[in-house]
Design a protein with these regions (language model features):
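N-terminal carbohydrate-binding/catalytic regions of secreted carbohydrate-active enzymes
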Residues: 42-106, 110, 419-466, 472-473
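Bacterial Sec-dependent N-terminal signal peptides
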Residues: 1-23
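CBM-like carbohydrate-recognition segments
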Residues: 24-56, 68-78, 84-104, 108, ...
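Oxyanion-binding "anion nests"
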Residues: 234-283, 287
Length: 637
């Protein structure tokens, strides 16, 4: 109980800090970024800027905003930015694989987003090029990636962020399970060589050959702990864990590394300001200063680690205090009504020409600027995490389970060539998926889960919410799993004990309804096997519905709901939304539990992610409204 109270207190404390003039700081900073860099990181008119990791940091922040707001301008910006470089055949302009520069892999994550959302092969082909680079990247003797071909035998902390999150996400896409050993080893090698046992911090770089002038002749390590290098490393860990298999034997090692990293980060957080210094362990060093990008990265890593349960809730203190310090020290309003980020060191590295010796004095010589892309991107990521942390958490400690037994379609994934489950799945980011609706639950503190087996008392016991959508016909699946009396009884007993059942059917011809409705009939809700709200082409108003004074949909006022099965009610079932004589949405209390039913899958990405519907339709608000209501009902047991 104390832990939950602590989490809530931190979230509330963060809430007023995230706003300036009524608008979220994450959105204001994104507006600044999209204005400064309209389609690439071109800062001088007529001058082409090369494929650069800086842009990838910004685009990941923009993607985080798109996922939280469903505002299409964010997706359009990501696509426009990458299309500036990616040709129709997947060639990446200005990219040279033969450089074996691991920085160049970073933007692959934005390409993966575009492929997953659009299915366009040019993005997949570009990703395959970056994947090929990783497979051919020169390595240390034990297998660690060189940072660049021009920096032989060297591993830098920066490189873990530039390469590993893409490596993990692409490996997950193509089902290359063996790759995860290699991914984990990159972090293990880096920590084994670069972690200082006394401070817990990691040195910026390690030279296996010990030939560099900056390298210690015994250890091969650079002399100092650079803030942003540790920031890259921390962000890499939380991003890789998103795709690292839950049952992989090396996942515990990554979690342990993350927790050791956050412990060191917490130790060197300035207690007065909540910020971190350019050189982390020399708070009293002459000329040392609080640095913005590192501070943003640590806030992002800590907040996300806690949200995703990669680290204990106590680490949220790092993020809450750091975010307050960032706003006080580095955020300033600009003439456009948005904000700027001050205080980011433009660059720091090791070796090269002119030679960078890694000394304390060197790190303090590099220029500090306003609105550096790396800092801006890290701030958007950090602010987005804090925006999520500030949301109410009715789902805390609850599990929302999505059925994949009655809805069990498969297709051949082009990237892997393997059969993959699809259509209304949490992980799908294309039109067919529930990615955005899944966020509606996780942002509110719930865990999401998928049940591939038939429902039983045992496998439903761990779920607070059970969602069944669009039961298969023989047209969709060779051997459909139909609803049976034993399943009806099992589910009904689970609801009676306090479960929340969400039934999202479909209209006649697009779902199996004859057997499926034996389940809903148990609760007094019958799917009529008809088809209402037929829509022709892009005449979206044909599917428009107005919502007023609705106990479930408290913020959505106009929604799009097409080709639906209407409902007939009996017993205690109540209509939630009607039009004319037709019942479109219904609910019923059953024992200690609740049932919600509508004759359409409704909240799949196509109609909630902002890319298709006109802006006056509020399906994303409706999806959030339903998620909040469902989670609230699950607490009323």
């Amino acid at each position: 109980m104390k832990k939950n109270i602590l989490n809530i207190a931190f979230a509330i404390a963060a809430l007023p800090l995230t706003h300036v003039s009524g608008q979220l700081l994450s959105e204001k900073m994104a507006s600044t970024a999209m204005s400064l860099w309209k389609d690439s990181l071109v800062t001088t008119p007529g001058r082409m800027v090369k494929w650069s990791y800086d842009q990838g940091v910004i685009l990941e922040g923009i993607d985080a905003l798109w996922q939280r707001t469903a505002d299409r301008k964010y997706f359009d910006y990501i696509k426009r930015s990458m299309d500036h470089y990616v040709e129709g055949d997947g060639t990446i302009r200005t990219y040279k694989q033969e450089d074996y520069n691991i920085d160049n892999v970073k933007n692959g994550r934005s390409l993966l987003t575009l492929y997953k959302v659009t299915g366009q092969q040019k993005y997949l082909k570009a990703c395959a090029t970056l994947w090929q680079q990783l497979h051919n990247q020169p390595r240390t003797r034990e297998g660690g990636f060189w940072h660049k071909k021009i920096y032989p035998y060297q591993m830098w902390l920066d490189g873990l962020y530039m390469g590993e999150p893409f490596y993990a996400e692409y490996a997950d896409l193509i089902k290359d399970d063996k790759a995860f050993d290699d991914i984990a080893n990159q972090f293990i090698y880096m920590e084994n060589h670069a972690r200082d046992k006394k401070t817990g911090l990691l040195y910026h770089g390690w030279d296996e050959s010990k030939e560099q002038k900056w390298a210690d002749k015994t250890t091969g390590l650079s002399p100092n702990f650079w803030g942003r290098a540790m920031g890259w490393y921390a962000m890499a860990l939380v991003d890789v864990l998103d795709y690292f298999p839950a049952g992989h034997p090396k996942r515990p090692a990554l979690l342990a590394i993350l927790n050791r990293t956050l412990t060191a980060v917490q130790k060197y957080q300035d207690p007065a300001s909540g910020l971190w210094f350019q050189v982390l362990d020399k708070a009293d060093g002459k000329g040392n200063y609080h640095e913005a990008s590192a501070s943003c990265m640590f806030v992002y890593a800590a907040a996300k680690a806690v949200r995703k349960e990669y680290a204990p809730a106590a680490f949220f203190r790092i993020a809450q205090k750091g975010y307050a310090g960032i706003q006080k020290a580095f955020i300033e309003p600009n003439d456009s009504g948005w904000v700027n980020l001050k205080g980011t060191v433009s660059v720091a590295g090791l070796g090269g020409n002119p030679y960078r010796d890694g000394s304390y004095e060197y790190y303090l010589r590099e220029k500090v600027i306003t609105n550096d892309a790396k800092g801006v991107g890290a701030f958007i990521l950090a602010a987005s995490e804090m925006d999520i942390a500030a949301m109410a958490k009715p789902g805390k400690g609850k599990t929302v389970t999505l059925d994949s037994y009655f809805n069990n379609e498969f297709y051949t994934e082009p990237a892997s060539g393997a059969q993959a489950s699809y259509h209304y799945k949490w992980e799908e980011r294309d039109n067919n998926g529930f990615h955005f609706w899944g966020n509606s639950y996780t942002y509110r503190g719930a865990r999401i889960n998928t049940l591939y087996d038939a429902p039983t008392s045992a496998n439903l016991k761990k779920s607070d919410v059970y969602i069944i959508v669009d039961a298969d016909t023989e047209k969709e699946t060779k051997n459909p799993n139909y609803m049976k009396p034993e399943y009806v009884n099992t589910i009904a007993e689970w609801v009676k004990a306090g479960g929340v059942l969400v039934l999202l059917a479909n209209d006649a011809g697009n779902a199996e309804l004859k057997q499926f409705t034996t389940l809903s009939d148990k609760f007094g809700i019958h799917f009529n096997e008809d088809s209402r709200n037929k829509v022709t082409g892009s005449q979206f108003e044909m599917g428009a519905l107005k919502i007023e004074n609705n106990p479930i949909f408290k913020t959505a006022r106009k929604v799009y709901l097409k080709e639906i099965s209407t409902l007939t009610l009996s017993g205690n079932a109540k209509a939630n939304l009607t039009e004319g004589k037709d019942v479109l949405i219904a609910t019923v209390k059953y024992g200690k539990g609740t049932v919600f039913a509508v004759g359409d899958p409704w909240f799949y990405n196509e109609y909630v992610d902002g890319r298709k519907l006109p802006a006056d339709f509020e399906n994303y608000k409706a999806a959030n409204d339903l998620a909040a209501w469902v989670l609230e009902q699950s607490s009323k047991k």
